[in-house]
Amino acid sequence: KIDQKEINQLFEAAHWAPSSGNRQPWRFVYATDGENRKKFNSVLYDSNAMWAPKAPMLILVFAETKNEEGNNIRTGMFDTGAAWMSLALQANRMGLNSRAMGGIDLEAAYEAAGVPKDRFTAICAIAVGYRGTDEDIHPRMVKNNFANDRKELSEIAFKEQFQS
């Protein structure tokens, strides 16, 4: 279980993330137990549903991508990514693990969290909890150390010109 003070610390870190025009377009809707948590768990695709419901907290992440007048907010998803990263860094500092998952039913996420579709875009879910064992995660990830496999820097950073 993650207590409310710890939950508040996570969202406090996210809330200080930089954003274009200080718009702060991120919306985090979380559940820890009860019927709402069951609804949140139901949006997970099978590969995530085998482990994520064991985490003490599940967060559904949305970005404001249209303003009140219906105009696009071009940086909404980028800024929300910065807020999620701030939350992840704070979780790590607190001895918690956080894992974002794109493997969710985005349409179901709106309903589960009660978020309006006209101005917000569903992005992902985040499981937050304590490190489990290899038995708690998908066997493919254990076998391939999938979670920590990274491209070479030369594949992602280029001086002056992109190279394929």
Residue ranges, per PLM feature:
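Acidic, surface-exposed loops and disordered segments
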Residues: 1-164
